[in-house]
């Protein structure tokens, strides 16, 4: 109820659950906000992960989560949940921030999220909170290792941003027969320097999709990654997008150019250059349709209760509610679904709970 109604606090949940539909839903009195917060510290985190696992299997059987161009994609990325100068817990990370010329200790939590990406659906599968002295890569390894042990066939290719060209990650994936496709942007890396030296003046592949023209370079069998002893492939894409802007009473066109470089273990004989570029941009799904949606529309950018178990459990419950909500949207007739913004459907759910409460006032 907390997440499906997009409530901002346990206090709001307590008020909503005291009367009307909230009370009928619970069939008993709603606990106070303090009781809910205390109970969230002892929630069954493995049980919540098991619920997400059953949902993943059901979505697969119902052909909701399907492969993209013959491959199952997953994205892993880090996210900072919130920060504070005053409140902390034993699992908080710390950093020094200069405020008005004075250094202050800031406490914060970061987490790594694992998302499955399909052509028409995305599913947030798991969540790992960083320990006090962890970096994002260490937490990501724990998360990926747990996913591989629990759901060994849920993905073929793992996508990641510029923090994930790490030998330990590539080795783990290759040990399990998986491939990596991650952004390569550190100009100090010998791998990127060597790849740029091999990119010719003319692109090896050009194509167009919508308003964007792609010029691509593809180099295989690079072995200049000292800590990773297998050969890798580097793909570069220079993308020019034509944008239209309205100034005063007329439209003006301008071009915007961006460059992307990816390193991957995928062989060119199995996945062509254009598909690598397409898959590489799917990484943004976890930013645009994951974190942005959860923070801006689901109010996940703050602590409901500052406790590590509570944070993990509530985010896993958020993943469950997120999947249920988007499954509900898929079952609405397209003509009706497209006529209303997504947030309106969330407000309608809240109204379903509020109307009985108002009618009984």
Predicted feature residues:
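Short, conserved catalytic/metal-binding motifs centered on acidic residues
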Residues: 13, 32, 36, 70-84, ...
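An anionic, glycine-rich sequence signature occurring as long contiguous blocks
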Residues: 179-283
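Electropositive, glycine- and tryptophan-enriched low-complexity nucleic-acid-binding patches
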Residues: 96-154
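Gly/serine-rich nucleotide phosphate-binding loop at the start of the catalytic core
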Residues: 1-31
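Domain-level cores of phosphate- or acyl-group-handling catalytic modules
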Residues: 134-191
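Short amphipathic alpha-helical "interface-anchor" segments enriched in bulky aromatics
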Residues: 270-305
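Active-site-proximal, Lys/Arg-enriched surface segment
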Residues: 37-119
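A short, flexible helix-boundary coil/loop motif
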Residues: 208-215, 220-223, 295-361
């Amino acid at each position: 109820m907390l997440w499906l109604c997009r409530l901002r606090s346990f206090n709001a949940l307590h008020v909503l659950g005291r009367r009307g539909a909230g009370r009928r839903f619970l069939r008993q009195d709603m606990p106070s906000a303090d009781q809910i917060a205390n109970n969230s510290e002892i929630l069954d985190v493995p049980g919540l992960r098991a619920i997400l696992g059953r949902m993943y299997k059901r979505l697969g059987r119902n052909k909701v989560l399907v492969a993209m161009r013959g491959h199952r994609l997953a994205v892993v990325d880090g996210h900072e949940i919130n920060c504070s100068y005053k409140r902390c817990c034993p699992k908080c990370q710390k950093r020094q921030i200069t405020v008005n010329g004075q250094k202050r200790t800031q406490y914060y939590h970061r987490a790594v999220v694992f998302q499955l990406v399909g052509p028409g659906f995305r599913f947030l599968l798991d969540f790992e909170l960083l320990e006090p002295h962890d970096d994002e890569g260490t937490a990501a390894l724990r998360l990926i290792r747990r996913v591989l042990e629990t759901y060994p066939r849920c993905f073929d290719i793992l996508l990641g941003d510029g923090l994930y060209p790490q030998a330990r990650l590539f080795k783990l994936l290759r040990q399990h027969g998986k491939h990596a496709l991650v952004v390569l942007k550190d100009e100090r890396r010998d791998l990127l320097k060597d790849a740029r030296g091999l990119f010719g003046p003319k692109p090896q592949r050009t194509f167009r999709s919508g308003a964007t023209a792609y010029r691509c370079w593809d180099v295989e069998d690079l072995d200049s990654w000292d800590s990773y002893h297998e050969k890798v492939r580097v793909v570069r894409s220079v993308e020019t997008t034509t944008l239209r802007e309205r100034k005063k009473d007329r439209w003006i066109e301008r071009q915007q150019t961006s460059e992307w470089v990816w390193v991957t273990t995928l062989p060119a004989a199995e996945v062509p250059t254009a598909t690598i570029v397409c898959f590489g941009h799917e990484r943004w799904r976890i930013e645009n349709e994951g974190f942005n949606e959860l923070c801006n529309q689901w109010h996940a950018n703050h602590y409901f209760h500052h406790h590590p178990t509570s944070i993990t459990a509530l985010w896993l419950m958020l993943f469950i509610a997120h999947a249920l909500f988007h499954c509900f949207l898929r079952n609405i007739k397209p003509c009706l679904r497209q006529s209303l913004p997504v947030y309106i459907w969330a407000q309608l759910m809240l109204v379903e709970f509020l109307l009985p409460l108002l009618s009984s006032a």
